[in-house]
From Swiss-Prot:
It comes from the Bacteria. The modification N6-(pyridoxal phosphate)lysine is found at residue 230. GO terms for biological process: L-histidine biosynthetic process. This is Histidinol-phosphate aminotransferase. The keyword Repeat does not apply. Its EC number is 2.6.1.9. Pathway: Amino-acid biosynthesis; L-histidine biosynthesis; L-histidine from 5-phospho-alpha-D-ribose 1-diphosphate: step 7/9. InterPro entries: Aminotransferase_I/II_large, HisP_aminotrans, HistidinolP_aminotransfase, PyrdxlP-dep_Trfase, PyrdxlP-dep_Trfase_major, PyrdxlP-dep_Trfase_small. It catalyses: L-histidinol phosphate + 2-oxoglutarate = 3-(imidazol-4-yl)-2-oxopropyl phosphate + L-glutamate. It comes from Synechococcus elongatus (strain ATCC 33912 / PCC 7942 / FACHB-805) (Anacystis nidulans R2). Its cofactor is pyridoxal 5'-phosphate. Homodimer. Pfam families: Aminotran_1_2 (PF00155).
Length: 373
């Protein structure tokens, strides 16, 4: 290791996207993107606005003024008049990953705190924390329901030895297991003490239809994060946003890098929100496809598959080695899935992609997995 690098970086593991590289056309079902691109008319509108509104020799709007106004309009639909969000409640990041990094810096850096996660969950929480030298406290989940071990969570936040927990990440619904928060889990979050920040990642909110946004004013130690990369079809543009107490948002705005979001990404996200009815109209079709795949896979004796409140399914075989072999065989046939947490996370694709997934799974199972009684 180079002598000027921090020694603990030797233990850090990067996020590994599926490398592909098979030389064949692939169904990309490993990153939970929407299977549908922006419609051609919206792409043309975006191109026109790029020509009209962007001077390439000028930096982007560092305050994200128009985008924040569009986000506030979107949020106002979801609060049902219970409270009125404003731009002071919103921060914007270069993907949710930048928000995660800023949150960790604001709460835990320099030995100020540790971060609590219930695994399996989104791996970037732990990855980013470790790159910053922040301790990660990992608790488990029930292997059948994927609910958090709340007793372990309570022990973690009340322990008095070592670095105190200052930050807790939860995903609603969770990735890779696709389960939404239960009422017991929500009740636990409601009583987390005010010196601990609770980040509720609602990346898949548009699919689950469940949000804790209405409760946000009662919990200044809550922050909700969301993304444009899933339901709003802008993964290529890397836009995430957070909603929280204005004092928390002001701190995150102070930490983030200047001009963090390119002008074209801001235009694309603003346009996506203007056209949200058109873009979100695909969600019922995706949910129908998700439920169809779930029913098909549920009767395969070699698989255990869980219900989903998101745009993906999570399944397991009898052993970790069988699951790894299944992922490799799917890739060899042209279907990329995410092998994680000793299971497979499969994004819901187009009907044609889903049919190929079912066929490829059947072939792989027939070849390598014994039937169970």
């Amino acid at each position: 290791m180079l002598p000027f690098l921090r020694s603990e970086l030797a233990r850090c593991q990067p996020y590994h996207p599926n490398p592909g590289g098979t030389g064949m056309a692939m169904d990309i079902l490993d990153t939970n993107e929407c299977p549908y691109d922006l419609p051609t008319d919206l792409k043309q509108t975006l191109a026109d606005r790029y020509v009209e509104a962007i001077a390439s020799n000028r930096y982007p709007d560092g305050s994200h003024t128009d985008l924040k106004a569009a986000i506030v309009d979107y949020l106002s639909e979801q609060t049902a008049g219970q409270w009125q969000p404003g731009p002071e409640h919103v921060t914007v990041g270069n993907g949710s990953d930048e928000l995660i990094r800023s949150i960790l810096i604001a709460t835990c850096l320099g030995g100020q705190g540790s971060v609590l996660v219930a695994e399996p969950t989104f791996s970037m929480y732990g990855i980013v924390a470790e790159t910053l030298g922040i301790p990660v406290v990992r608790i488990g989940r029930d292997p059948q329901t994927w609910e958090m071990d709340l007793a372990a969570a309570e022990t973690a936040i009340t322990q008095t030895e070592g670095t105190p927990v200052r930050l807790c990440f939860v995903v609603h619904p969770n990735s890779p297991t696709a389960n939404p928060l239960t009422e017991a889990e929500k009740d636990w979050l409601r009583q987390v003490p005010p010196q601990i920040l609770v980040v509720i990642d609602e990346a898949y909110f548009e699919f689950s239809g469940e949000t804790l946004l209405a409760e946000l004013p009662q919990h200044p130690n809550w922050l909700i994060t969301r993304t444009f990369s899933k339901a709003l079809r802008l993964a290529a543009h890397r836009v995430g946003y957070g909603i929280g107490d204005p004092q928390l948002i002001a701190a995150l705005e102070a930490i983030r890098l200047p001009y963090n979001l390119p002008s074209v990404a801001q235009l694309a996200a603003t346009l996506a929100l203007e056209a949200r009815s058109q873009l979100l109209s695909a969600i019922p079709r995706l949910i129908t496809e998700r439920d169809r795949l779930y029913r098909k896979l549920q009767v395969v004796s070699q698989l255990q598959v869980w219900p989903s409140a998101s745009n993906f399914l999570f399944l397991k075989t009898q052993s970790s080695s069988q699951t790894a072999a299944l992922a490799a065989q799917l890739k060899a046939q042209g279907t990329l899935v995410r092998h994680t947490a000793d299971g497979l996370r499969i994004t819901i694709g187009s009907p044609a992609e889903n049919e190929r997934t079912l066929a490829h799974l059947q072939t792989a199972i027939t070849q390598s997995l014994p039937a169970t009684v």
